[in-house]
């Protein structure tokens, strides 16, 4: 369980497990009633929000995704997908999430067929 208070943040990172392939996840358990004043961009709210950062380049590629957050939302993404959480302000309430990771035993040679 991760708890964040105002002005705290979780910098961009990835997860690893015992295997090369795996999944990370986050479930939203509690959100503050406000994330406070936006300092970076009023039109795109970022305070206290999860941002998933892709590795794609190109004119039609979306390099990041900021999912809408509601209580009990559950997001699953690959281990090696960078992600971060921005700080929030203006409240003493807590942002609480549950994070979980799991290895995926995948063999690309054995799993090539369309069986």
Q: Which ranges hold each PLM region?
A:
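Catalytic core of non-heme Fe(II) oxygenases with the double-stranded beta-helix
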Residues: 2-76, 84-86, 93-94, 108-113
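A short alpha/beta connector and helix-capping loop motif
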Residues: 91-102
